[in-house]
């Protein structure tokens, strides 16, 4: 009998983490959960530990760790609880771990994901901020360690599936003309512009096709999510920003396309369910059952496409500008967006002010060369401070 693949799931209580665990549980003959991590949903993390019996669990604070450890013992589990970023990095780099699902949302996921990279793991990357913030450094570390990097975003996984196996030689070398990154357009695609001032966090989080966490749902509504994915695609596939085009596709059936110089366009289709890209990346280069229902083309009936309106979605324009500027600009973009989205979810600002905060931060802070991780976090810290200053000036 072959050895079970040991899997660490960073961000286990989030939507991607839960979908990953669903796929893993379908294949007990292949995979075993090594570690689970959570941030705020401690009762959910406990339930996941009871179900999957990991070797380790990681939580952010010592008090939460003590409570969880007591609860695990009461449940008869030997799971050891670790604390903080050090614990995250430990379960990402442990010698027994084969695969790391990097699904922590935001900048907090960067260090543990890099720990997995440096340890040469197979990394299923859902944390887009890791590449957005430190793309050049991140990809350099991947090449140095020999880590296997597989995208979990449905769009990037679709691109990966449509690319030739030797795409790392360069897009022009393998005949790729451009990448077409699809977007649903979110819940406000047809909302009159004047009404965007009044939309609520709950409305922003009501995605028409996907079930996601609140932060990424707001990013989808503003199309910042697609802007971050554009930056991520540039690093994953060594593309220039002008080689990545965003296309609105409301049905979310085509997850992305690759346009070749001979006139061929390859697309990956499927029901909008994260378990498809997770299963693809988890078993690559093989295929396994994901639990996702087959796509019914007769029920889909039609596929629509339209160009994104940058007046409606200024965050997409800002992200493209950051991609073109490079260096510290994407890290600042991401940091300002995280602060702005948190303020919107707390009802401190209106929806259009998310883009206003980001644009002002990018205008105030000059782009600097990023040569190490310290410079990345310095840019992140400065941008967060400027965004908070904006809130202090403009929010009563």
UniProtKB/Swiss-Prot annotation:
Keywords, ordered alphabetically: Isoprene biosynthesis, Manganese, Metal-binding, NADP, Oxidoreductase
Origin superkingdom: Bacteria
A GO biological process held by the record: isopentenyl diphosphate biosynthetic process, methylerythritol 4-phosphate pathway involved in terpenoid biosynthetic process
Biological or metabolic pathway of the protein: Isoprenoid biosynthesis; isopentenyl diphosphate biosynthesis via DXP pathway; isopentenyl diphosphate from 1-deoxy-D-xylulose 5-phosphate: step 1/6
Needed co-factor(s): Mg(2+); Mn(2+)
Coiled coil: none
Residues reported to bind 1-deoxy-D-xylulose 5-phosphate: 128, 154-155, 184, 207, 220, 225-226, 229
Enzyme Commission number(s): 1.1.1.267
Family membership noted in the UniProt record: Belongs to the DXR family.
Protein name, entry field: 1-deoxy-D-xylulose 5-phosphate reductoisomerase
Species this chain originates from: Pseudomonas fluorescens (strain SBW25)
